[in-house]
Amino acid sequence: MEYGLLLLRLVVGLLFAGHGAQKLFGWFGGGGPQGTAAFFASLGYRRPAALAVVVGLSELGGGLLLASGFLTPLASFLLVTVMLNAIATVVWPKGFLGGYEFELTLATVAVALAATGPGEISLDDAVGWADELSGILWASLVLSSAIVISVITTTLGRGTAELDEIPG
């Protein structure tokens, strides 16, 4: 089971980290901060440049935390929040198949890892936190907090974008 959790954390965590690097640095064919901010502006976010940095850091930092199994509930919270926002603002209109099933799967994996913990091959376990930072309470806290932040972000954070804030 430990190797399965390690594989799951590495694949999902590094996938998120790669997407964060796309947003922050333009690596791997990403748009960088300017392209990401322009995309967020097209979705109606009021502070697209700031959001580009926050989302990029959430994906990069959360992905690396998840991959290493360190502060797993925090990693899960960051990643679930990003996925719920993506579902609500980008892929929901496309429906389940060909729409939001990928983002929902990633969010579910992150919540599940908050519940199970990162496993014995993790930094949380190495420092003795794995048992304290896992369980249904942590998974519930991750999911409920991510829902609250996502609702706030998608409702109060959208309106007329400050286009002059987009870098470049």
Report each predicted region and the residues it spans.
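Generic signal for short, ordered secondary-structure residues
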Residues: G18-H19, F40, G63
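Non-catalytic alpha-helical scaffold/packing segments enriched in small hydrophobic residues
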Residues: G35, F39, G56, V80-M83
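Hydrophobic, membrane-inserted alpha-helices
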Residues: L57-L66, V82-A86
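Physicochemical signature of membrane-embedded alpha-helices that form the seven-helix bundle of GPCRs
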Residues: L51-V54, S58, L78
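Residue-level signal for alpha-helical context at structural boundaries
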Residues: A38-F39, V54, G95, F102
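Alpha-helix boundary/capping detector
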Residues: P33, R46, L65-A67, A110-V111
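Extended, low-polarity transmembrane helix blocks
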Residues: M1-F28, A49, L71-G168
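Membrane-interface interhelical connector segments
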Residues: G26-L51
